Design a protein with these regions (language model features):
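A polyanion-binding, active-site-adjacent surface
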Residues: 1-117
C-alpha cells in the first residue's frame, strides 16, 4: 500500500526550500516532519536559527517560516518497508509537483536536499 507524504510547510515569502525524500514511519505516525527520535534535523535547525528544538512542533514550524525556510519532500507517495530511503521501491515513486509549488512560491532562490534518494 502506498505511503502518502505531507503537504509543504511554506509561506509566500519562503526563500529556501529544504527537501527530504519521504517522511519516515515515526514522522508519518506523528504527522510531523522529522519526528524520528534520532533525527538531527530539529536540533540542527534550532542551533542554526536560535530556537529550542524541544518547543512544540507548531512553533518550530513557525520559526522555520519566519526564517524564510520551506519544508517538503521529493516524493508525494511511494511504497517502502520501514523508514530507510534505500527501501523505497523505485517503480512506485510519485514525485511532488515542483513546477506548481515554485510558481506559487516565486521567492524561492535555493533548494537544499536532506535525503539520500
Amino acid at each position: 500500500m502506498p505511503l502518502a507524504g505531507f503537504a509543504p510547510v511554506a509561506d509566500s515569502q519562503a526563500r529556501l526550500l529544504i527537501l527530504g525524500s519521504m517522511p519516515g514511519v515515526r514522522s508519518l505516525t506523528a504527522g510531523q516532519y522529522y519526528a524520528g527520535p534520532r533525527n538531527r534535523f530539529w536540533p540542527l535547525m534550532g542551533e542554526f536559527l536560535g530556537f529550542d528544538p524541544a518547543m512544540p512542533y507548531g512553533r518550530r514550524l513557525g520559526e522555520m517560516t519566519d526564517a524564510g525556510i520551506a519544508l517538503w519532500d521529493v516524493l508525494q507517495s511511494c511504497e517502502r518497508e520501514g523508514s530507510l530511503d534505500a527501501s523505497i521501491v523505485e517503480s512506485t515513486e510519485v514525485p511532488n509537483d515542483f513546477a506548481a509549488f515554485l510558481e506559487k512560491h516565486s521567492h524561492i532562490r535555493a533548494i537544499a536536499f536532506n535525503g539520500q534518494k
